[in-house]
Amino acid sequence: MASPGVYLFTRKGRRAYVGRSDRDVVARTRSSYRQGDYDLTITVYETASARQAYLLECRLFHRHRPCDNDIHPAVPAGTNWRCPVKGCPWS
């Protein structure tokens, strides 16, 4: 069954990219993974809601500062959610 969630790709053992799906994290992981760019090990966190996925993605983005994430995670369309990390301009 599809669920929202967050995923982490690594390169040479270091966090390189954090992403999320508000509907189906496994499908999103499959479509986003580029063999040769990332290690074969992928970390996936399923969440109970799109909101939880967004909040977790923000926390992981700030904690790991992945080199392949150029910008802060986007707020899902139609929501006014804020980043949970204190001091972030998106909070």
What is each residue range found by the language model?
Residues 1-15, 21-91:
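Boundary/linker segments flanking structured domains
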